[in-house]
Amino acid sequence: MFSTSDQVSKMNSRILSALLILGIATCVIAGGFCPKSRHPQCNLSYKINDCCAQSDCRVGSVCCVEGCGNVCRAESDTPLGEKFVDGSECKHGHVFPKKWYQFR
């Protein structure tokens, strides 16, 4: 049948495969935090949303709520900023507030 070295080799490859899957799952689940906002106040009359979901950002980045719109920022180890919540109302690009006559 199999020699001892074949069994050890198969066991090692299974362990490595399990560790790889565990590592990938940890990275996906971790998600990261938003760093401190660079511009908490916005002087513009509109916002620019670069992201409207976490999937809009590259790996290692997270969609964060900033004063002038949502932006992808490098993940932080500590929660200092506000992370965008997937499923929240959002529109990509330039977003202008309602005109005074549209409020009711």
Curated annotation (Swiss-Prot):
Give the subcellular location: Secreted
Is Secreted found in the keyword set? Answer: yes
Q: Which domain of life is it from?
A: Eukaryota
Molecular functions (GO terms): toxin activity
Sorted alphabetically, the keyword list is: Disulfide bond, Secreted, Signal, Toxin
InterPro entries attached to this UniProt entry:
Elafin-like_sf (IPR036645)
The record's similarity note reads: Belongs to the venom protein 11 family. 02 (wap-2) subfamily.
What job does the chain carry out?
Has antibacterial activity.
Name recorded for this polypeptide: U20-lycotoxin-Ls1d
Native species: Lycosa singoriensis (Wolf spider)
